[in-house]
Design a protein with these regions (language model features):
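Structural motif
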Residues: 33-39, 60-64, 129-134
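Short N-terminal or domain-adjacent regulatory/targeting segments
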Residues: 1-25, 105-113
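Short internal beta-strands
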Residues: 55-66, 82-83, 152-156
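Conserved N-terminal structural segment that caps and organizes enzyme catalytic cores in eukaryotes
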Residues: 3-4, 38, 162
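A short, charged/proline- and glycine-enriched loop
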Residues: 21-32, 122-125
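Histidine-anchored nucleotide/phosphate-binding helix
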Residues: 37-58, 140-147
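Acidic/Gly/His-enriched mid-domain segments of enzyme catalytic cores or analogous surface patches
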Residues: 63-126, 139
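Cysteine-centered metal-binding/redox modules
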Residues: 7, 133-144, 151, 155-605
Length: 605
């Protein structure tokens, strides 16, 4: 980028795709474009932080960037405050995001201005805050924003032609936030949490460096875990907090410590199947705390608390309050009571990890292993992404999770229980047409209904015949590699070339937008090791190439599947990656040398 730090300039397609899921789920409820310099740096920072606290993605253009820098505000994509550039023309980079969202998620044809503007107006929740004085260039930019459906709010009063709902004069900068949300009809869901620091999805990507760290809880070095336990209603005292061991202020600065938190839940509609669903949310809940970083899950978690957050008064009870408030808020349909126990005593953490947590994880893993597409009575739809891709429908099964990687069959089941009219609806599977393809009359009827007629047929296990649609939020793309008679897979994080002659972004432009593209499909990372992956075409033994990082991530599970299905040991050693080849000819040589099974299979086309 030609822009100087901290300005980012152009935002890559991969960044837009990463924003897709939080925009769909409402974790990012809107996009603010702030132009020019505020009357004072204090007003600039107050406005930016007010949007950040609401989870809104904030993009900055012009003088407001230096005002935020001068005030020492932490900026960057990780905390959802993105300085684009100091010149007003840098606003084109956020306009580009809106346009590409229409192309990526909405399947809008490039050049179709009418449908493009309809899409941005209806589906991209953006607005502009423009500080006085406004020159001709800023006015022109504002007119462009209005044409895309984005209202402009300004404190300029001279020579301004007010347009209701589109060009709004608000002289009081402290009211820009409320005026903007009302103009764009953005509803903010607020979870009131009594803690000494901010809590917002904008902090979810925040990195806490070692030098800024007050204390670290490290599951790779100490006994740590997080666990949800279902109890009877009489066994749980709602909102009870128990601390076993020292609090954060009794721990040495910069030290590695142990921690365990046990969340007891009870409710008439609570099911033990929901426990891992709740636990997976802890990662997001803890990361949303300003100055706290969480990675991992189960008994391999790592949590860092920053010095600033500690000095603001953040202690164990505040961590418990975050877990309690979010569980009660998000899962109120099934949780009537919730109590949190935090353990920091070393002996107790070790004892509870081995006697309580690990056996619970083992029981769940057994349950998940027994969950197959054949063993369950129903599947679920997921249409969360229709906010961006109106014709896309995911069919979620135990062995095929949502293509975003975030919605498993248990997640969809829990979502349906919590919100029976919501995005995850029951799909029966009683009328089988072709078991090998994964085609059912009931599934066809469901996708036709949920796509409002855009789709008529879908198969669950084929890449060639009516494959499932993709929206644009997919973790991976799989495509036919004709030279080797197999398929290559690439993931969003990999920006290099593939043996298909296309990058992830180029493949995604063919695959997304809610359309069916035989020979290509978007999918989640976990689906790669599923016994149902491309079952109709021969399964995982068709995989001939994927980026090395992705291969390393899925190796253990994929090797296990290949061993069970084909009695092949260390199957991933036969799969090419970018260190071996990025062109089909070199890849074929490698596969031949390794004796890859795809070379002996029936042609896919």
């Amino acid at each position: 980028t030609p822009y100087e730090e901290p300005c980012s300039g152009h935002l890559m397609d991969a960044t837009i795709r990463e924003l897709g899921v939080p925009l769909v789920t409402g974790d990012i409820p809107g996009v603010a474009v702030i132009l020019g310099a505020a009357p004072t740096k204090e007003e600039a920072v107050e406005l930016v932080k007010s949007y950040q606290a609401q989870g809104i993605l904030v993009t900055l253009v012009g003088g407001v960037i230096d005002q935020c820098l001068e005030a020492g505000l932490n900026m960057g994509a990780a905390v959802r405050i993105i300085p684009l550039g100091r010149d007003v023309t840098s606003v084109i980079h956020v306009v580009s995001v809106a346009i590409r969202a229409a192309l990526i998620f909405g399947n809008v044809t490039p050049g179709d201005a009418g449908n493009l503007m309809k899409y941005t107006f209806e589906r991209v929740p953006a607005f502009v805050n423009a500080f006085a004085p406004l020159d001709d260039v800023i006015v022109a930019c504002g007119a462009g924003a209005i044409a895309l459906g984005f209202p402009v709010i300004t404190n300029e009063t001279e020579n301004i032609f007010r347009v209701p709902k589109s060009l709004i004069v608000q002289e009081d900068v402290s009211k820009f936030n409320a005026t903007s949300l009302e103009a764009r009809d953005i509803k903010i869901k607020i979870t009131k949490i009594d803690i000494p620091v901010s809590f917002a999805s904008a902090f979810e990507g925040e990195i806490i460096r070692r030098g800024d760290m007050q204390v670290e809880f490290d599951g790779s070095r100490k006994d740590c875990f997080e666990l949800v336990c279902t109890k009877e209603l009489t066994e749980v005292e709602d909102h009870k907090f128990t601390l076993i061991g020292p609090d954060f202020d009794q721990m040495e600065v910069g030290s590695k410590q142990q921690i365990a938190y046990i969340v007891d839940v009870a409710g008439k509609n609570m099911q033990t199947d929901f426990e891992p669903v709740f636990e997976r949310k802890f990662h997001s809940y803890v990361n949303c705390i300003e100055g706290v970083m969480h990675t991992g899950q189960r008994d391999m978690i790592r949590i860092r608390v920053s010095k600033n957050t500690y000095e603001a008064g953040f202690r164990a009870k505040d961590l418990a309050e975050v877990l309690y408030a979010n569980i009660k808020n998000e899962f109120d349909a099934v949780v009537d009571k919730c109590a949190v126990t935090i353990v920091t005593d070393a002996e107790e953490c070790t004892k509870l990890r081995h006697e309580l947590a690990v056996p619970a994880y083992d029981r769940r893993d057994e349950r998940l292993t027994s969950l197959t597409d054949e063993s369950v009575p129903v599947y679920y739809s997921c249409i969360m992404c229709q906010a961006f891709s109106p014709s896309h429908v995911c069919v979620v099964t135990p062995e095929r999770l949502g293509l975003c990687g975030a919605v498993s069959w248990l997640d969809a089941k829990a979502t349906n229980e919590l919100d029976p009219e919501g995005p995850c609806q029951v799909i029966t599977k009683e009328r089988v047409i072709d078991e090998n393809l994964g085609r059912y009359e009931d599934v066809d009827e469901a996708v036709a209904k949920f796509s409002r007629g855009a789709l008529e047929h879908v198969t669950l296990y084929s890449i060639m015949e009516d494959p499932m649609t993709s929206c644009g939020c997919f973790e991976c793309i799989c495509g036919i590699e004709p030279f080797s008679n197999g398929v290559a897979i690439t993931n969003r994080e990999y920006t290099g070339m593939t043996p298909l002659g296309m990058t992830f972004g180029e493949l995604a432009s063919m695959t997304g937008g809610g359309v069916q593209t035989p020979g290509f499909m978007g999918h989640g990372k976990h689906f790669i090791s599923s016994k149902k992956f491309m079952k109709a075409e021969g399964g995982v033994e068709r995989i001939v190439w994927m980026p090395k990082d992705l291969k390393d991530q899925v190796a253990e599970r994929l090797n296990k599947t290949a061993k069970e299905l084909y009695d092949i040991d260390n199957f991933t050693d036969m799969i090419g990656d970018e260190t071996v080849a990025t062109d089909p000819e070199t890849l074929l040589e490698f596969l031949t040398e390794k004796g890859h099974p795809a070379l002996g299979l029936e042609p896919m086309m």
